[in-house]
Amino acid sequence: MKILRIFILSGLLFAGSNDALSKASAAMKAGMYKEALGHISVSQQTDMTNPDIYRMKALLHEALDEPNHALIAWQYCLKYSKNKILSSEAKVHIESLSQE
C-alpha cells in the first residue's frame, strides 16, 4: 500500500510538470508570452534540469526582447542538454546573444 501511495504521488508530481509545460506551449502558440513564462516557472520548480524547459524559456525571453534573460536560459539549456541538436541550437543562440 505504501508503494502504491508513492507511485501515485510521483505520478501527480510529474503530471503537474507536464501539464504546466503543455499550458506554456499553448500560451506561447497563442502569443501570450508573459503567461507562458508563468507556466514555465511552475514547470521549472518540479524539474530544474530539463533542458526543454530552459529552451522554451529562452525563446520566450527572446520574443519579449529580453536578451539577458534569454542568454541565461540558453546557458542552462546547454548545461543540462545531452542532445547534440539541442546543444548546437543553444550554442548558436548564446553566440548570437553575446554579440548584442
Q: What are the roles of these predicted feature ranges?
A:
Residues 17-28, 55:
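Alpha-helical tetratricopeptide repeat
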Residues 18-19, 52, 85-89:
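Start-of-helix register in tetratricopeptide repeats
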Residues 29-30, 63, 93-100:
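Register position in tetratricopeptide repeats
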Residues 56, 89-93:
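Canonical tetratricopeptide repeat
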